[in-house]
Every structure is written in structure tokens, then in C-alpha cells.
Amino acid sequence: MSSAPASGSVRARYLVYFQYVGTDFNGVAAVRGTQRAVGVQNYLEEAAERLNSVEPVRFTISSRTDAGVHALSNAAHLDVQRRSGRPPFPPEVLAEALNTHLRHPAIRVLRAFRVPSDFHARHAATSRTYLYRLATGCHRRDELPVFERNLCWTLPADCLDMVAMQEAAQHLLGTHDFSAFQSAGSPVPSPVRTLRRVSVSPGQASPLVTPEESRKLRFWNLEFESQSFLYRQVRRMTAVLVAVGLGALAPAQVKTILESQDPLGKHQTRVAPAHGLFLKSVLYGNLGAASCTLQGPQFGSHG
């Protein structure tokens, strides 16, 4: 579970789950140097400085999210070596200490666990699930309730053809070369991914939104599960499925796009905005019940 450096103190590795509203951040990854933009990781590592570790604490993030993307539950591992031979922090104490010293109210550490010294938060993940939220019937931005702004993609259409979207989604299931849904020029060893689950279902407004405010709006949830995704793959798949829901594409055309394996095709102009996307969960098969899956009630589905 740990290594014993020459100083006599113990270096302990932890897995931490954390959540954030991504609106104010330049993504989850730390921004180094003199840039004014700041990532979620910058704040986490700043809080970790107060742990007084022998070595600077660095977070290795499981799943990188872009600017404006949110996380109900992301994960990272970190090593902490206390001074003067003190024993490692209990996980719950570590989580509480990080939250105490976090300087941004849109970030919160959820839980922490001790893990083996060779555990890797990114490589060990067995499942990642993303949620994308849509709101239809919103013809102007000022029609969207305050407590839904920057938390969903608004569409002026009154409704989506959910049956057609569900039919189109079936073409994406399974193991495929997803080159057509990755950003052109994104270097990856292989564009092949296995999409284990994709769902399209009615959603609901935040419980902070009054019935009168949401009377003309309809909410929709898209969920995607895989061990890993290509850069912006989820946002591009979402945009294509929305095009099907609006009648701009037929369900069969999604299969054609997928099989084209063309990252420069006309469909590449379709990218869903970042603010509707949430990293919902990151799971680790070897941790069993330790994996932390959270879903706020405002993001649930009916039925």
C-alpha cells in the first residue's frame, strides 16, 4: 500500500473523487506558467500544499475535461509523504483537509481511498460515463431559468424525435474505429473504442427551477459509457444524434458517418457545446464498492 523513503516517513498513495462546475475553469488539467487561465487541478494542488508533504503533491487526473465541461465525479491519484515520520493521513481526514483549503466554491472533494503505490487513476479505470443534457423549447437565452444556465444545451425546437435518436444511437454501440468522431489532428495510438452503452431519454429540470419557469421547456439526457473516449468524441456523437432528433439527418446516416472514418468530413462542423456535458462517473473494477458514482437529482431521468 505504500513505500518507505529513507527519511523514515511513509509515502502513501490515495485515490480521490472530486466534482466541479466547469464554467469558470480552463478545463480540469492544471495550467502551468504565467497564463491567466486556471484549471481545476491548479486549485486542488494549491489546497494540497497545505498538507505539508515532504514532496510537492501532484494530482494525476483520470479523465481530462475541456473548458466549460462539468464533473459529477472525476478521479485522481496523488502521493502524500508526511514530515517527521508521521503516519499517513486517514483517507477521510485527507478529503476533509483538501476541502478545507480549497479556494474555489465550484470544486469539492467527495471521497478518498488508500490505494497501492503502483495504482494509476487514468490507466486503471474500467468505465467512464458521460451525461449530456439538452433543453428544447428555448427560443431565446433569457428564457432559460437562471439555475439551468451553463448546465445544458438549449435548442429552439419544441421537441426531439427520441425514437429516431435511439435508433441512430444503436449504430454507435460496440467496438468501432471512431475516427469520424474525433477532432482532426488529435494524436492517439488507436481510434478504436468500445461504446458499451448509449441512451437517449427524457430528463428533468433542476429542482431549483419552478414549474412555471420550465413549463415550455423539455429536458433530455444522453448517456455514453466506455472505458475511454477520444478527444471530443462524446460532444461530436451528441451533435450528430441531435441532428437526427431535429430531422437534419436520418438514423442510417449515422452509420455512414461512422463507417467513413473521416475526421475531416462535413459532419465535423457539428460539435455540441461544452457546457451541456458532465463526467458522471469513473469506475475501477479492482476497487469494488470503493468506486464512487454520483448523480445529482436534478440530472436524473424520468421513469
Swiss-Prot record:
Record PTM Phosphoserine, positions in chain: 84
Enzyme Commission number(s) from the entry: 5.4.99.-
Entry binding sites for substrate: 130
Reaction(s) the record says it catalyses: a uridine in tRNA = a pseudouridine in tRNA
Superkingdom of the organism of origin: Eukaryota
Keyword Hydrolase tagged: no
Alphabetic keyword roster: Isomerase, Phosphoprotein, tRNA processing
GO molecular function: pseudouridine synthase activity; RNA binding; tRNA pseudouridine synthase activity
A GO biological process held by the record: tRNA pseudouridine synthesis
Record-annotated active site: 66 (nucleophile)
GO cellular component: intracellular membrane-bounded organelle; mitochondrion
EC top class, as a word: isomerase
A Pfam family per the record: PseudoU_synth_1
UniProt xrefs under InterPro entries: PsdUridine_synth_cat_dom_sf (IPR020103), PsdUridine_synth_TruA (IPR001406), PsdUridine_synth_TruA_a/b_dom (IPR020097), PsdUridine_synth_TruA_C (IPR020095), TruA/RsuA/RluB/E/F_N (IPR020094)
Entry's family note: Belongs to the tRNA pseudouridine synthase TruA family.
Record protein name field: tRNA pseudouridine synthase-like 1
